[in-house]
């Protein structure tokens, strides 16, 4: 899940319309490496600016792919990867780690768009005012189905359980927070937090990354079978994605407009909020001191260790070897060293 940057509160029908849209990138003739199916974690908003640049500028076909299909969520991508209906899923370390730990799912993370995850418990200062994990006690928290394992991980990492509060099943419309149905709402710092604040409310965030769960997110997640059978295609995909996200980092507002005017044109996205969300993700989530040194999507040994430790604190028992296979990305940068210089 991600949030709806600029999606008007009360826009559940907009979400429903996007969920029925099952294709995104256009396929071109040719392409020795075939077509890849990509499951997005959320709707086609600015969160996927890099993918939109890669598609619209022809980076996927330039890399040798016949095309890439972008299927909107919400989804963790686990079911799609295991069923074979997706070759790549934009997911997160908790969702993939949980599947590996609990189901022995043969999945791997091969890179991460977000060096820092943007999940938060969003509240309104004059209502829920959830500023610390202790503030969750006794509160009603709206949790979407795709975020159940994430919220359970947050509770476990902070010594809490669901019996300490009330979990309210919700969809992705933050109006339930505004109207008082819930005190807190699982959201993205770059999306719903902006949306609700834009409505004039003073918002309070409880970021997962600052409260026991500093895991990577918007991860490029694949099956071990895909790594074995489609390695060259996945590497080509990563090359195109690096180029796309280089553009998104250097011109976040243009990336936002690709969502507003093209890929998400039927969603009613708010231009100002979309630009703000795209800028925040470009400056605070996608890049870091480590990406400057190692390149976009890389996950340093330190960040791997922090991710594994955060999962362990939430009761998810996996090793770095279980969760990550960064050899494809290593090969991409070794073969294309010019891609390191994303900050043009």
Question: For the regions a protein language model found, what residue spans apply to each?
Answer:
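Secondary-structure end/capping motifs
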Residues: 230-314
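Bacterial lipoprotein signal-peptidase II cleavage site
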Residues: 14-30
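Short, glycine-/small- and polar/acidic-enriched structural segments
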Residues: 6, 27-169, 175-179, 183-187, ...
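Short, solvent-exposed loop/beta-turn-alpha elements that line the ligand-binding surface or hinge
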Residues: 59-64, 132, 210-213, 228, ...
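Extracytoplasmic/periplasmic substrate-binding proteins
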Residues: 193, 197-216
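N-terminal export signals
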Residues: 1-17
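A bilobed periplasmic-binding-protein/Venus flytrap-type ligand-binding module shared by bacterial periplasmic
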Residues: 120-130, 216-232
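Conserved C-terminal helix/tail region of periplasmic/extracytoplasmic solute-binding proteins
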Residues: 302-344
